[in-house]
Amino acid sequence: MERYDELKKGESGALVSIAAYLVLSAIKLIIGYLFHSEALTADGLNNTTDIIASVAVLIGLRISQKPPDEDHPYGHFRAETIASLIASFIMMVVGLQVLFSAGESIFSAKQETPDMIAAWTAAGGAVLMLIVYRYNKRLAKKVKSQALLAAAADNKSDAFVSIGTFIGIVAAQFHLAWIDTVTAFVIGLLICKTAWDIFKESSHSLTDGFDIKDISAYKQTIEKISGVSRLKDIKARYLGSTVHVDVVVEVSADLNITESHDIANEIERRMKEEHAIDYSHVHMEPLEQK
């Protein structure tokens, strides 16, 4: 039940993000429209996609807390990943829309210099998102949630987007109104890049992709355990933010069942202690004599 308790605690991070994005997106879109800032409007649209992404994380965390059943013997942990994948599609659509609008403005003869209130709005948004980022990063490490850690990274990128918006609007005050539009275009690219990164990571996880470097680290741990004659096979995959490892090891044929079972327990203990892996399935085979 410990993992489910951690997922429950992680909900607060998603809720904080949702609240922050609701406030920021409304303020930025209104001020961006009233004071003629393409960059701030794009920043506000970016925050609306973040609302969707944060809601997806929240839904994923809640579904992931459902215990295993007949249809889902491994639990519902992948709900986090599926929700993130859906959010990436929505973010990509909004990012492309921002690029399209910015592109039209670049080739338009009508370009207005945004008011400085738009710049200060962007600066305030950057400060708020840095605070939310630090909160979610600490919480993500505490509850060991990759989805929440990704949300924290998104918070951080949003802070930098707002800083870029601030710089673009300030530069536009020096009779360079086109800089505000160019900044909006760059923000559109950043939204698309974030969407692609989330899609790439989520699809990699859903297709049972895994980091080879982590597999190598697991191998080193298991091969050092007393009683393990040979590590025959090892596979790992993500189920949401949890790692499941399947191990096949060869042990001396002279060992009895109890001794072999003790080795399996030691493998599970070391994997949890050194790599924070709670789910290890160990299969024992007698050492093949060559």
From Swiss-Prot:
Its main location: membrane. GO terms for cellular component: membrane; plasma membrane. Coiled coil: none annotated. GO terms for molecular function: monoatomic cation transmembrane transporter activity. The keyword Lyase does not apply. The keyword Transmembrane applies. Disruption phenotype: Deletion of the gene has no significant effet. However, a mneP-mneS double mutant is manganese sensitive and accumulates high levels of intracellular manganese. It is found in: Cell membrane. The chain crosses the membrane at residues 15-35, 39-61, 82-102, 113-133, 159-179, 181-201. It is a multi-pass membrane protein. It holds the Pfam family Cation_efflux. Keywords: Cell membrane, Ion transport, Membrane, Transmembrane, Transmembrane helix, Transport. Induction: Transcriptionally activated by MntR in response to manganese excess. Expressed at a basal level in the absence of MntR. Secondary manganese efflux system. May prevent manganese intoxication. PANTHER family: MANGANESE EFFLUX SYSTEM PROTEIN MNES, MITOCHONDRIAL METAL TRANSPORTER 1-RELATED. Belongs to the cation diffusion facilitator (CDF) transporter (TC 2.A.4) family. NCBIfam families: CDF. This is Manganese efflux system protein MneS. It comes from Bacillus subtilis (strain 168). The gene is mneS.
